[in-house]
């Protein structure tokens, strides 16, 4: 039994509140246990200069935490005048993951801005951001479809992410909270599509190593969790699912 009473292959409670914000084309509040992230999707009728004239769109992301998302207040990065390496890595990861399942040609010469703002952090903020951002993005695409700006919702598959790790007492566990993540021997983030294809795997031994057999066990646990997360996405999207499947 884990610190919060879950089984080793059990996700935290997941809830996705759609249309959480008034102004964006798509928005959600995703809750994964005590981690809460607001994800919004904004559509601009232009692309970055390097994409002009190619007839394709672009998806990019920004990520941030409010100061008291964590136990101790952190200084806003805007106050520091620069984005940290961690933040840059996460927002590139989010954009890269989403682009893997978007049909950029169907999107046309538009940019989708994904903004992920962590309002409470208890581990897994980047994976929750990806899972929530996918839903926000599809909601924005559905508005483009309603406005007849696209011929179909420009996504090729579902996309979700979770964390897995190895704890000394429990072995391989799914969806680590902060207390577990801070003492894990191995920590891994996994992004997968609905068809079971990997988009990205980030795994690190924390003063420890892991075997090929453990790697397979980690990936199996991640897939188990991601398939459940995709079902949560489908529930949140409702009738829009018929335009994806």
UniProtKB/Swiss-Prot annotation:
Disulfide bonds: none
Organism: Bacillus cytotoxicus (strain DSM 22905 / CIP 110041 / 391-98 / NVH 391-98)
Signal peptide: none
Gene Ontology molecular function: 3'-5'-RNA exonuclease activity; tRNA binding; tRNA nucleotidyltransferase activity
SUPFAM superfamilies: Ribonuclease PH domain 2-like, Ribosomal protein S5 domain 2-like
Family: Belongs to the RNase PH family.
Protein name per UniProt: Ribonuclease PH
Protein function: Phosphorolytic 3'-5' exoribonuclease that plays an important role in tRNA 3'-end maturation. Removes nucleotide residues following the 3'-CCA terminus of tRNAs; can also add nucleotides to the ends of RNA molecules by using nucleoside diphosphates as substrates, but this may not be physiologically important. Probably plays a role in initiation of 16S rRNA degradation (leading to ribosome degradation) during starvation.
């Amino acid at each position: 039994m884990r610190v919060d009473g879950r089984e080793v292959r059990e996700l935290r409670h997941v809830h996705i509140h759609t249309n959480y914000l008034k102004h964006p084309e798509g928005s959600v509040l995703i809750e994964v246990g005590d981690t809460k992230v607001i994800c919004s999707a904004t559509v601009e009728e232009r692309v970055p200069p390097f994409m002009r004239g190619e007839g394709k769109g672009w998806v990019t992301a920004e990520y941030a935490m409010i100061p008291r998302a964590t136990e101790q207040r952190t200084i806003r990065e805007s106050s520091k005048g620069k984005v940290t390496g961690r933040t840059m890595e996460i927002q590139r990861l989010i954009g890269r993951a989403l682009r893997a399942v978007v049909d950029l040609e169907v999107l046309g010469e538009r940019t989708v801005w994904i903004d992920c703002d962590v309002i409470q952090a208890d581990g897994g903020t980047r994976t929750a951001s990806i899972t929530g951002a996918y839903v926000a993005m599809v909601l924005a695409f559905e508005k483009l479809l309603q406005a007849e700006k696209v011929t179909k919702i420009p996504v090729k598959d579902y996309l979700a992410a979770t964390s897995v790790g190895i704890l000394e007492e429990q072995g391989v566990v799914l969806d680590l909270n902060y207390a577990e993540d801070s003492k894990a021997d191995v920590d891994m983030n996994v992004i997968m599509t609905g068809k079971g294809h990997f988009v990205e795997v980030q795994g690190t031994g924390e003063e420890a190593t892991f075997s090929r057999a453990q790697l397979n066990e980690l990936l199996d646990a991640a897939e188990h969790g991601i398939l459940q997360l995709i079902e949560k996405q489908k529930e949140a999207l409702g009738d829009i699912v018929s335009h994806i499947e």
